[in-house]
From Swiss-Prot:
Keywords, in A-Z order: Hydrolase
Cofactor: a divalent metal cation
Protein name from the UniProt record: RNA pyrophosphohydrolase
Signal peptide boundaries: none
One Gene Ontology cellular component: cytoplasm
Length: 161
């Protein structure tokens, strides 16, 4: 076990983006992951394609994950945030090449309506979605991402209220 832990720590982080998508009521889009039986809710996120800027990646990922790009960027995080996935998940994610993700986060105002959202995309990541209040967000998020989400909420909170 010690060797696998060391191996885990030697792996790099995958570069990506995360999106805190707000509706008109300042509720946040969360989706329930399709690839687990756990109640794993999260905000949309994804990788950065080589040559792509983080802001372009965020809008592309928004379209890929919620089926709509109706929105605009309010703010970009001041730093990169990272999280490690549990070591048991590493072989199942990203071909086992990464220990977790290092992400630039974006606060996005969704300008569409609920009917514009379609999670049944060509490569769906969610089987359910809903709008969550800022107060409930941290309680429903998958635990290994909670510390990152706390930091993102702290950075963007003054822009939401």
């Amino acid at each position: 076990m010690r060797n696998s832990s060391k191996k885990h720590l030697d792996l790099p982080y995958r570069l990506g983006v995360g999106m805190m998508i707000l509706n008109a009521d300042n509720h946040i889009f969360v989706g329930k992951r399709i690839d687990t039986k756990l109640s794993a809710w999260q905000m949309p996120q994804g990788g950065i394609v080589p040559g792509e800027t983080p802001s372009i990646a965020a809008m592309r990922e928004m379209l890929e994950e919620i089926g709509s790009d109706k929105g605009y960027i309010i703010a970009e995080s001041k730093c990169w945030y990272s999280y490690d996935v549990p070591s048991l998940l590493i072989p199942k994610l990203w071909n086992g090449n990464f220990r977790g993700q290092k992400q630039r986060w974006f606060l996005i105002r969704f300008t569409g309506n609920n009917e514009d959202i379609n999670i049944n995309t060509s490569n769906p990541e969610f089987d359910q979605w809903r709008w969550a209040s800022l107060d409930e967000l941290l309680s429903i998020i998958i635990p290994f991402k909670r510390k990152l989400y706390q930091a993102v909420v702290k950075e963007f909170k003054s822009l939401i209220q």
